[in-house]
Design a protein with these regions (language model features):
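Non-catalytic C-terminal accessory region of glycerolipid acyltransferases
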Residues: 2-4, 35-157
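Membrane-interfacial amphipathic helices and adjacent loop/beta segments
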Residues: 7-35
Length: 157
């Protein structure tokens, strides 16, 4: 995307290794740490940049909301929904898939909208994005793997 002139900001843990960090930066991708970046993330959206967040990771209850994922409650980051709502930006999901000729095709879903307000809007949008992830996994299970326990955090009884 950055190669095509789209400003892309990626939120996540700091990449290991100077080579990896230089590689990402050389592609025009700006990175933000996964903690303490909410102001910068919202500002990036308000500037019209694309903000990328991995939403298929297990979260601690203090940092996530429970939504349905493959029929099981999954504690999921609400960050994409929160930032989109704060910035007044559209919320979309994008899934790259590798084609037979070794290029990548990106499927874009959304924009996701809600008639809810406040915390209910965050949960509603997070559920909609999670459903899109679920469909992407169903469409291309060979493109997906988790190296962590996705459903580790359980909802309170």
């Amino acid at each position: 995307m950055a190669k095509r002139g789209v400003k892309l900001t990626l939120i996540g843990r700091r990449l290991r290794g100077a080579f990896n960090r230089r590689l990402v930066a050389s592609r025009g991708v700006h990175t933000l740490p996964d903690r303490g970046s909410s102001g910068a993330a919202v500002a990036a959206l308000r500037r019209g940049e694309v903000l990328a967040i991995a939403v298929d990771q297990n979260m601690r209850p203090s940092r996530g909301v429970f939504v349905d994922f493959f029929g099981t409650p999954a504690c999921t980051t609400p960050a994409a929904a929160v930032y989109a709502l704060r910035a007044g930006a559209p919320l979309i999901a994008a899934f790259p898939t590798r084609s037979k000729n070794r290029t990548h095709v990106v499927k874009v879903c959304g924009p996701f909208e809600t008639s809810e307000r406040g915390h209910r809007a965050v949960i509603d949008l997070t559920q909609k994005v999670t459903r899109a992830v679920e469909q992407a996994v169903r469409d291309h299970p060979d493109h997906w793997f988790w190296v962590h326990r996705r459903w580790k955090t359980r909802p309170p009884e």
